[in-house]
Amino acid sequence: FKNGLPDRLIEGGEFTKADYDVRQGRVIQAAHDLVAGGKPCLPPNPDWDQTFMKTLLDGELAAYDDADDNELASIGGGGVHEVKTWTAAFAALRAAGVYQASIDCYHAIPEWLTGMGVMRAVQT
């Protein structure tokens, strides 16, 4: 990274307004390109997202154990780290005891280059 972001994340440092503006500009341009039919990245994949959320809901946490990052990215886009984070969160829930989960909502938002889902879990 030319902007030193990894160093700032690890060692701390200021994320300036100019840094933010550059990043925001890239995201806005990618969203415009995607909506206009361009392909800077994969569009949201609501079917895959909802299947993944249902997998978590059903407690099938090993379902993606054999998938590598490239495979997940080719299906689900750039949110591979989120897949791992959600899976880790549900594994922690399981380790803490019995729980009941629900999918509260999901919306694909192409202009944001993503789908947004909300799940909740309560220990029972």
List where the protein language model places each region.
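Flexible, D/E/H-enriched segments
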Residues: 2-124
